[in-house]
Amino acid sequence: MAYLMIKKSIYLFFDQPTAVGTLILAFLLTLSPVIIYYEQKKRGLRRNRTAITTTPLPEASGAWPVIGHLLLFMNENDLNHVTLGHMADKYGPIFSLRFGRHRTLVVSSWEMVKECFTGTNDKLFSNRPSSLAVKLMFYDTESYGFAPYGKYWRELRKISTHKLLSNQQLEKFKHLRISEVDNSFKKLHELCSNNKQGGDTTYVASLVRMDDWFAYLTFNVIGRIVSGFQSNAVAGATNSQEKYKLAIDEVSNLMATFAVSDVVPRLGWIDRLTGLTGKMKNCGKKLDAVVGDAVEDHRQKKLKISRNNTGALTEHEEEDFIDVCLSIMEQSQIPGNHPEISVKSIALDMLSGGSDTTKLIMTWTLSLLLNHPDILDKAKEEVDTYFGKKKISDNTPVVDAADVPNLVYIQAIIKESMRLYPASTLMERMTSDDCDVGGFHVPAGTRLWVNVWKMQRDPRVWKDPLVFLPERFLSNDKGMVDVKGQNYELIPFGTGRRICPGASFALEVLHLVLTRLILEFEMKAPEGKIDMRARPGFFHNKVVPLDVQLTPRTLD
């Protein structure tokens, strides 16, 4: 800037009379060192605010020209978090990779995570990198989940956490959760009732694909709260729900598909050639149509209420998240140029992210319990002792959020399951400015991968880290460790400003469902052991579906 000012003044100098020009030139020659000094000082201050050191990030070996480390992650059978874990064993808890033009910082210790998400770094690491999937299926920068950190995102976050997912609002929607969980358990009992023998008094174990049932349950619970979908709805409504569910399932599959353009934008033609771009565009259109129809139905419902001059829902109508969002939008509190897109993006984010995360945690938790029958027996003893035999006599025991604090072993089981098998093994962010992490300089635009899976198995932090041991969370050492982002050694829901806003909701559903399963069913693995292999992909899915032998429990 100082150079440009001097250059501009020289042009002015040649336009002035000689005497005046001489005075101006003398003045500039005197002033220019001062200008240059302050410009350099300002740059230095900016540099000092963001980067105390200039030590570059250590880079893993094996990078190729142009594509960088891409080939290390091209084996479709390898799990990225495991590959990165092996690299951390070699390079330490902080190192970098290159993918095309993108530099990626990889951290795998709680100390490094704390550096990234405390102080000024927390704000700098509050962006998520965009991707082909986000651009084509999730409204790009207007998506709640992927919008850049700034006023727009903060307003959406405020709406989500304070007006949709606050404790007060969750209490208001409590009857919807319980209703859908009840409906799902009734379906499960119906499956088992078909296997009665001996004059309809003796149950024979029924083989049930539990990961499918978990998906059914979580979609119904979240769909009911977000958009009013009911699992026992009439045929027309059920058809809409099925379209919704199919679109969400397609999103999950496409999100797990590698897009070349996310790494090397100039090679975007490969994604078009393979058909990935077209599939994502079509899926995005389906999602927008389904969510748009739901929003329009809710708008018509509000107009009907307005025309009737009642100002309130009838006894047959329920308020859900979309209703709340539309009310906020009417008060002009939804930010951005397209408030309706904001409403749709919030609904879509909750339906897609919430359903997958909760289903996966349930699936891994039950898998672990079936492979450790001694721990399942301890959980059963706690549940039976707390609720008593009386509530097992019918198939609709009252399990409420208020019961959770008393079920300490159930809480420990779910924590330990999320420690070993987090729903998302990698947490991804991007820095908006230069910063320092671990004594290294991190340039602006660097992507961040937090290897949650590796960090939560750190032997420095966890004794016998590969062992499923819920008792560790009952000890004085780990008893106070929480999963809501404040204890950096255990962050299954993330941490920092972009921590999952639905963590409390997910935990309530997890405790409710696991407790009822243990209360109402005897559960066994059909072939002795459950296969615990994980499938590569965006979410931490199992390779083999979870088939379980279920027998309803009865009084002795």
Swiss-Prot record:
Keyword annotations: Alkaloid metabolism, Heme, Iron, Membrane, Metal-binding, Monooxygenase, Oxidoreductase, Transmembrane, Transmembrane helix
Predominant localisation class: membrane
The organism's place on the tree of life at top rank: Eukaryota
Reaction(s) catalysed by this chain's protein: (S)-cis-N-methylcanadine + reduced [NADPH--hemoprotein reductase] + O2 = (S)-1-hydroxy-N-methylcanadine + oxidized [NADPH--hemoprotein reductase] + H2O + H(+)
Cofactors (names): heme
Listed GO CC annotations: membrane
Membrane topology: Single-pass membrane protein
Regions crossing the membrane: 18-38
Function description: Cytochrome P450 involved in the biosynthesis of the benzylisoquinoline alkaloid noscapine. Converts (S)-N-methylcanadine to (S)-1-hydroxy-N-methylcanadine.
Homology family: Belongs to the cytochrome P450 family.
Entries under PANTHER family matching the protein: CYTOCHROME P450, CYTOCHROME P450 82C3-RELATED
The protein's name in its UniProt record: (S)-N-methylcanadine 1-hydroxylase CYP82Y1
Organism: Papaver somniferum
